[in-house]
Structures are given as structure tokens and as C-alpha cells.
A protein has these predicted regions:
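Core AdoMet radical
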Residues: 1-17, 25-90, 96-101, 106
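Charged helix-capping and loop-helix junction motifs
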Residues: 16-21, 114-117
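Oxyanion-binding "anion nests"
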Residues: 98-101, 114-126
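Nucleotide-activated chemistry modules centered on ATP-dependent adenylation/adenylyltransferase
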Residues: 110-111
Length: 126
């Protein structure tokens, strides 16, 4: 009934159109389609939702911005605020649901767990 479509962080290897086509195919066989992909803009989330995606998971990795900067030295993933705002863009793009999490263990797991909960709380209040 449900499937999770997963990509890496490379737009080159799995661009939004490719993911959209995968959603269209999956929609023929599954009731719910989840995505675990790199963060995209609101228009792209709208497109993916129109292709059949229902929800999105984006791992923040860590909410410790100093640690995050040491893990991502270059490229699109380096922009912490863009990743932080991914769930909000997904909801604005029409997704029915979003998921939050840090990769516990990259930094103090207690602080990241609390920050994940506060991230959800923050978005619920917007």
C-alpha cells in the first residue's frame, strides 16, 4: 500500500523530473508515496506532489550548525538554512505530510533530539 522512494543528494543522478516519473509509476501500484530526497524548492515539491508524492522526509543531519559546517565543506548541502526549511517548502508545495529527524550521533544526540522536536513545534505554530 505504501512505498518510500529514496535518492542520494545528487540532482545530477536523480533530477526532479526523474523522481516525478518514478512517482507516476509508483502511483499505479501504491496508495501512498513517500520521498526521502534532497531538499528542493516549493515549486518542485508541488510538481512532485502532482506526480503522486504524498509526504517527504528530510534528515537535518544535525542541528549543531558548527558541526554541520565541518561535515559539509562545499556544495548545495552546505547551506544549512535551506535544509532546515525543506519541510515548510514541502507543505507549501502541497505535500500531505513531512517527517523530521537528525542523524543521531553526529553531535550530542540529546540536543539533536530536542532540536528535532522544537523544529516540529516551530513549524506547527507557523
Amino acid at each position: 500500500e505504501e512505498i518510500l522512494l529514496l535518492t542520494g543528494e545528487s540532482r545530477k543522478m536523480s533530477d526532479v523530473e526523474y523522481i516525478g516519473e518514478a512517482c507516476k509509476i509508483a502511483k499505479k501500484y501504491f496508495k501512498l508515496i513517500g520521498l526521502e530526497i534532497y531538499p528542493v524548492n516549493s515549486d518542485e515539491y508541488t510538481y512532485l506532489h502532482q506526480c503522486g508524492a504524498d509526504y517527504v522526509t528530510v534528515f537535518q543531519e544535525t542541528y549543531n550548525t558548527d558541526k554541520y559546517e565541518t561535515l559539509h565543506l562545499m556544495g548545495h548541502k552546505r547551506v544549512w538554512p535551506y535544509r532546515f526549511d525543506a519541510q515548510e517548502r514541502a507543505l507549501r508545495g502541497g505535500m500531505r505530510g513531512v517527517a523530521f529527524s537528525a542523524l543521531l550521533g553526529l553531535s550530542d544526540f540529546r540536543k539533536d533530539a530536542l532540536a528535532s522536536a522544537l523544529h516540529v513545534y516551530y513549524l506547527q505554530r507557523k
